[in-house]
From Swiss-Prot:
InterPro entries, per the entry: ATP-dep_Prtase_HsIV_su, Ntn_hydrolases_N, Proteasome_sua/b, Proteasome_suB-type
Keywords (A to Z) from UniProt: Allosteric enzyme, Cytoplasm, Hydrolase, Metal-binding, Protease, Sodium, Stress response, Threonine protease
Record's signal peptide: none
GO BP of this protein: proteolysis involved in protein catabolic process
Species assigned in the record: Rhizobium etli (strain ATCC 51251 / DSM 11541 / JCM 21823 / NBRC 15573 / CFN 42)
Protein name, entry field: ATP-dependent protease subunit HslV
GO-annotated molecular function: metal ion binding; threonine-type endopeptidase activity
Gene Ontology cellular component annotations, sorted alphabetically: HslUV protease complex; proteasome core complex
Localization annotation: Cytoplasm
Record keyword Metal-binding present: yes
Main subcellular localisation: cytoplasm
Gene: hslV
Entry binding sites for Na(+): 156, 159, 162
Protein family according to the UniProt entry: Belongs to the peptidase T1B family. HslV subfamily.
Length: 175
């Protein structure tokens, strides 16, 4: 698995993820890029779960964003509907976080499209550790990127499926 986190604070939205790819109990790769910009570069997405499944879902989300430009919520809901009802997609094992300047969403294979509270959310094997760490840091004066990095570091210290090779994408919300 992996850990992906988003933090929305101080006019920034940050998504960060670690780089570990595991096959069973073996680390196969330590520098995978599981957080990236999609669409026209105005949406950031991160995934946890089976890599091939996640790429399939990212491609589908990009197509939905082409259908519904500038409407991340609508694109995410349409993807979740397809994911839940399509026989092939229903078997995909992945979760996604997506964010643009106005909204952050968690998308699951159960058809859930969730907008987090408190300015942060996390998914993956170390998601609960990262989420708790970020929540604890949200009331400090630390900027969004520092909170995301620190939360992932804490998750990587605890979760064997998360490493310290962190990739960060950032959007300016106020521009």
């Amino acid at each position: 698995m992996t850990t992906i986190i988003t933090v929305r604070k101080g006019g920034k939205v940050v998504m960060a993820g670690d780089g570990q790819v595991s096959l069973g109990q073996t680390v196969m790769k330590g520098n995978a890029r599981k957080v990236r910009r999609i669409g026209k570069g105005d949406v950031i997405a991160g995934f946890a779960g089976a890599t091939a499944d996640a790429f399939t879902l990212l491609e589908r989300l990009e197509k939905k964003l082409e259908q519904y430009p500038g409407q991340l919520m609508r694109a995410a809901v349409e993807l979740a509907k397809d994911w839940r009802t399509d026989k092939y997609l229903r078997n995909l094992e992945a979760m996604m976080l997506v964010a643009d300047k106005s909204i952050t969403l968690a998308i699951t294979g159960n058809g859930d499209v969730l907008e987090p509270e408190h300015g942060t959310t996390a998914i993956g094997s170390g998601g609960n550790f990262a989420f708790a760490a970020a929540r604890a840091l949200m009331d400090t004066d630390k900027p969004a990127e520092e909170i995301a990095r620190r939360a992932l570091d804490i998750a990587a210290d605890i979760c064997v499926y998360t490493n310290h090779n962190i990739v960060v994408e950032l959007l300016d919300v106020e521009s």
